[in-house]
Amino acid sequence: MENAQTEQSASKTNGLLYSIGEAADLLKVSIPLLRLYEREGLVLPMRKSSRHRLYSASDLNRIRCIREMINDHKVSIEGIKRLLALIPCWKIKGCPEEARNTCKAFTSQMAPCWLETDRSWDCKSAVCRVCPVYENYANCGSLKQTIIECTIESTPRPHDVSA
């Protein structure tokens, strides 16, 4: 399964994969920092059968976004997790209401859906790394736009009162 996941993800990135050392060099960060981001669930690198981490260009963009939030905007790792928890995975995946209401990813605002262990029907067997909820939000701009759109859609509108 891991090899299939790596091959599937590699084909989506045109085969451009970087070891943890190469990724750290490209990003000008330490290897322990990349491991911390993984432990905190902010990035889900691919794994070779040898368990070595592989980072795609999308992973590097995600890490750049994380670094920008931390360094430029002073957002903590917990704050980033809460921002990622705002991604409406149930909407993106089309979860039915009954599944959504029992899913921790819907009812909790503490962490992104890929960190929840009690997930809905569709996500129990899914590989989060290749899920559109995780894949589509590798940069800050798309995350910000989605949060704006969902906030606008869910903002109560005053009822039209006819005289």
Regions found by a protein language model. Give the residues of each.
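Basic helix-turn-helix/winged-helix DNA-binding cores
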Residues: 1-68, 72
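Residue-level signature of transmembrane alpha-helix interfaces in integral membrane proteins
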Residues: 57, 75, 92-95
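Short amphipathic recognition helices of helix-turn-helix/homeodomain-type DNA-binding modules
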Residues: 69, 73-87
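Cysteine-cluster motifs in flexible loop/terminal segments that predominantly coordinate metals
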Residues: 86-159
